[in-house]
Curated annotation (Swiss-Prot):
Keywords: cAMP, Chaperone, Chromatin regulator, Cytoplasm, DNA damage, DNA repair, DNA replication, Nucleus, Repeat, WD repeat. Belongs to the WD repeat RBAP46/RBAP48/MSI1 family. It holds the Pfam family WD40. This is Histone-binding protein MSI1. Present with 149 molecules/cell in log phase SD medium. The gene is MSI1. It comes from Saccharomyces cerevisiae (strain ATCC 204508 / S288c). The lineage of its organism: Eukaryota, Fungi, Dikarya, Ascomycota, Saccharomycotina. Gene3D superfamilies: YVTN repeat-like/Quinoprotein amine dehydrogenase (2.130.10.10).
């Protein structure tokens, strides 16, 4: 089961010796492995990360959505926040006159003014209750951010109302625009579920519909999948307690949900009971396709391919990665790969249709796969504890962000000669 790092202590002594040695070896080889690498250490680990779709071309500044996870030690520090980082793409590198023969690389002009080497916190939003398991911005309006909470609710925030001068105020008043919270729904699945644990419920994941603005999908540890329309929000009643649809799974926790990118009604869900299911918002209660025979140990993540939405990837706690043709999910996967240990999440590249990234929940590795040949093409080994989330950048095709339980936030780009980019 994906525990979201909640049983991990963050002391250096908790890091196994072999991982410390692996990190030391990795660090010595970073100049050969990366075209760009920026490592940051934060006060608290983040359970989520996502590059924003915008880019400041004058400074090559990227924005990243992150969170603070305190494991209930300091609830007042539980936040979602937006940080900025420049990858220095705007800097004009100097001529051969400034080629450094010792390091065998070009250096910028001495007069060049560099931006901060570290993440700069731009806006912080106090998370009102519980811990933020996953945060994602609305694709049609990135100022709107949804956070899945360990208290079972989904909180919706408006970034424009949380400037730096309002942080203190936001902690006093309600920082959220809308709260989505409903244990009952209008539709129930035909399969029974164990309701004895319904009082112990977390919102484990969420996903925005790319085709219908304001349509939000959420998964829950009590076995429910819920679909929300945040356009039901009103200033007088900011709490929406009735989802459009509430579907019970196979009786076990739902770990992840994802919309088909090219369709407004089809979505997939994966469960602790090893099920990967395809569902249709229009039918509301029937699974179109489902398979629970090809995974073990609980399926932690599932994602549709952006370029070919008939391909669905899923990964489980034993490290198995399956690729499905959703037209034949009752059959064997079209491809199977092994990450090695439990996979916390996976993400298809939005730029290359066969490239997929998996995040190791236990080994701390992010692996990039070429699924056309079912081979690993790059491994990021800079984290010393489990990786919680990963994100691809929309502007730089190979740029990634990854966050881990060792309080690290890494922004990195593999060397072109290793993955085949110029």
């Amino acid at each position: 089961m994906n525990q979201c790092a909640k049983d991990i202590t963050h002391e250096a002594s908790s890091i196994p010796i072999d991982l410390q040695e692996r990190y030391s070896h990795w660090k010595k080889n970073t100049k050969l492995l990366y075209d760009y690498l920026n490592t940051n250490s934060t006060k608290w680990p983040s359970l989520t990360c996502q590059f924003f779709p915008d880019l400041d071309t004058t400074s090559d500044e990227h924005r990243i959505l992150l969170s603070s996870f305190t494991s209930s030690q300091k609830p007042e520090d539980e936040t979602i926040y937006i940080s900025k980082i420049s990858t220095l793409g705007h800097i004009k590198w100097s001529s051969l006159n400034n080629f450094d023969m010792d390091e065998m690389e070009f250096k910028p002009e001495n007069s060049t003014r560099f931006p901060s080497k570290h993440l700069v916190n731009d806006i912080s939003i106090f998370f009102p209750n519980g811990e933020c398991n996953r945060a994602r911005y609305l694709p049609q309006n990135p100022d709107i951010i949804a956070g899945a909470s360990s208290d079972g609710a989904i909180y919706i925030f408006d970034r424009t109302k949380h400037g730096s001068t309002r942080i203190r105020q936001s902690k006093i008043s309600h920082p959220f625009e809308t709260k989505l919270f409903g244990s009952h729904g209008v539709i129930q699945d035909v399969e029974a579920m164990d309701t004895s644990s319904a009082d112990i419920n977390e919102a484990t994941s969420l996903a925005w519909n790319l085709q219908q603005e304001a349509l939000l999908l959420s998964s829950h540890s009590n076995g429910q999948v819920q679909v929300w329309d945040i356009k039901q929000y009103s200033h007088e009643n900011p709490i929406i307690d009735l989802p459009l649809v509430s579907i019970n799974s196979d009786g076990t926790a739902v770990n992840d949900v994802t919309w088909m990118p090219t369709h407004d009604s089809l979505f997939a869900a994966c469960t602790e009971g090893n099920a990967v299911s395809l569902l249709d918002l229009r039918t509301k209660k029937e699974k179109l396709q489902s398979n629970r025979e090809k995974h073990d140990g609980g399926v932690n993540s599932c994602r549709f391919n952006y370029k070919n939405s008939l391909i669905l990837a899923s990964a489980d706690s034993n490290g198995r990665l399956n690729l499905w043709d959703i037209r034949n999910m009752n059959k064997s996967p079209i491809a199977t790969m092994e990450h090695g240990t439990s996979v916390s999440t996976l993400e298809w590249s939005p730029n290359f249709d066969t490239v997929l990234a998996t995040a190791g929940q236990e080994d701390g590795l992010v692996k990039l796969w070429d699924t056309s040949c079912e081979e690993t093409i790059f491994t990021h080994g800079g984290h010393m504890l489990g990786v919680n989330d990963i994100s691809w950048d929309a502007h730089d095709p190979w740029l990634m962000c990854s966050v881990a339980n060792d309080n690290s936030v890494h922004i990195w780009k593999p060397a072109g000669n290793l993955v085949g980019h110029s």
